[in-house]
């Protein structure tokens, strides 16, 4: 692994490779430690070995504002299994050691960052091999203290482009973000029940005009056709969270079935890119 392949470098290398192949990225989300730290690592292995181009990982948190019941369930299972922030950083370091070129992003809430001290949190994230951090409850307008700490530690700050954002917000997201842009397919909480269906072409063309980092479409991405549609509309790929976590919830007591089902789902979603 070259010394230069850090933070945004891993995203750039991944997007460049996919572009050369004429493909998009499939990026699954899971909560670290769900349903247990040990099984969590096997789940991540299964995702990567079956075609995940990058990972989006959450730290368990007991009051996730933006998350629907599926991801809240993941948070509670992980906490019940005793997963602490320290355990999360240890898991991240193991994943990084196994997959030196894989982009690894964190998606979490400001409280978890504050609890560590902002600078200390990003320092730990860097040591664990994290490439990017998205703080779900901090809008771009209020993000300066986090972004400055992120950049000081070579970590890409990720921002959400909401479906109802005006041009001013999209310009700010484009200028402030690194690595990739998290494009919401609809406002609200995460989940598979209301399918992603917002026409995103307009936002995608604006993001392109503002030279934003590559946009990944998230929220409600649960089936291969949605991945294909996102990429066709101009996204660099798609993020799927609740659909992945739902598989973990359903098969949490049957490890073999869980990993097999997750492998099949990941292969099908990746094939759609």
From Swiss-Prot:
Coiled coil: none annotated. Belongs to the TrpA family. The active site is at residues 56, 67. The alpha subunit is responsible for the aldol cleavage of indoleglycerol phosphate to indole and glyceraldehyde 3-phosphate. This is Tryptophan synthase alpha chain. The keyword DNA repair does not apply. SUPFAM superfamilies: Ribulose-phoshate binding barrel. GO terms for molecular function: tryptophan synthase activity. Tetramer of two alpha and two beta chains. The keyword Transmembrane does not apply. It comes from the Bacteria. InterPro entries: Aldolase_TIM (IPR013785), RibuloseP-bd_barrel (IPR011060), Trp_synthase_alpha_AS (IPR018204), Trp_synthase_suA (IPR002028). Its EC number is 4.2.1.20. It catalyses: (1S,2R)-1-C-(indol-3-yl)glycerol 3-phosphate + L-serine = D-glyceraldehyde 3-phosphate + L-tryptophan + H2O. Keywords: Amino-acid biosynthesis, Aromatic amino acid biosynthesis, Lyase, Tryptophan biosynthesis. GO terms for cellular component: cytosol. Pathway: Amino-acid biosynthesis; L-tryptophan biosynthesis; L-tryptophan from chorismate: step 5/5.
